[in-house]
Swiss-Prot record:
This is Aldehyde dehydrogenase, thermostable. The active site is at residues 255, 289. Belongs to the aldehyde dehydrogenase family. NAD(+) binds at residues 233-238.
Amino acid sequence: MKVQTEIKTYFNYINGNWVSSVSNNVEPSINPANRHDIVGYVQRSTLEDVNEAVTAANEAQTSWWKRSGVERGEYLYKAAHILEQCLQDIAETMTREMGKTLAEAKAETMRGVHILRYYAGEGARKIGDVIPSSDSEGLLFTTRVPLGVVGVISPWNFPVAIPIWKMAPALVYGNTVVLKPASETAVTAAKVIECFHEAGFPKGVVNMVCGSGSVVGQGIANHPDIDGVTFTGSNTVGKQVGRAAFERGAKYQLEMGGKNPVIVAKDADLDLAVEGTISGGLRSTGQKCTATSRVFIEREVYEPFKAKLLERVKQLKIGNGLDAETWMGPCASESQFHTVLSYIEKGKSEGAKLIYGGNRCLEGELANGFFVEPTIFEDVDLQMTIAREEIFGPVLALIQVDSIEEAIKLANDTEYGLSASIYTKNIGNALEFIKDIEAGLIKVNAETAGVEFQAPFGGMKQSSSHSREQGQAAIEFFTSIKTVFVKA
């Protein structure tokens, strides 16, 4: 394809150098708020590019591991400092490339800074335990060693935070990495990797290969010299990645979809519940794995809750995320835009009652982007498609229930188990919910979306491979335990 000279081309990062794909092919990254705006051109890489990156990572791993954890952490501190200096540019790029508001993009980039600093500190923490031995002359202890080369396959919805929360622990524990960012946000990823480059990481320790999931992603999952694969994305692709890694004996970590419920008890603070439902379900255009999708409301407060919800959603401004007044931006890509619209049509055709939104936004400049109105359905049956499948868009399904017990039972009627929330003033309701809800992330009087980097994150059932990311739990995936017995 012919490249416009005024638009920058971004390259793969292999062995400390910015390089073109051996294919010499690039593809445009499109601004979803204005499909005529090309953010940049990114590489369409091949398996040969993957092989080069893995070779570089493999050759660098031993010397990287021989450095102390404290020294490895110093590189993360440097990267954090540079990322913070570049916050405005990276956030603006993220907004142009993915569509979320600039405020959200800034917050996410700052989250990346905090994650890097957190894991920099982990380089000085313990990596084992002393265990009493039954032999009075023996010393029994454990230590941890890195996996080796880790493949990181990251999604487009958090193009700064998710790659960093995977790469930072991998690196501080002595692994080298090959990042495959989502094609939709590869320009943002390149700017993040530039921060690692400027931080002076040794050649081969950090690598990035851009391209399709079917070529680059699957190439990473299948590669015999990649010792671990950490993936965030759809269930369909995640299962393919996990299967490929399992078949060759590599360690794998999958964070996938969600169909996250909110329960609104009859004693709830309805204003708080409405704000949490809207923020959890509609911010970032509902494109979060922890986004609210199903809302179970006790019958006694259903009508007042619905009225407040509709009143509030009418106040939301839809527009370009670079506009300071915008509350909700576009769907991140044309394909996601059409996916969301198709789910809305399924909801209507299967008998759910559309009470708000449901249309493409065609007013003024919105017609140039992939904008969908916030959409609310009621009279939703649990067997309807919109109540069962992850939509990844600004769509809420309202469901009346007669009790908290019924709400929990219905909320658990899904293959997913990522995040769940309850709004209540009754501690008994909260404790029952915490005990019985099938989710890895549980919120009380707070929205389903949002995680804290210092705490373990992951789901149950089909939402996860049952491992956990972030916090000190990250060491469990990115290292292996050695048990050592020493005889005096």
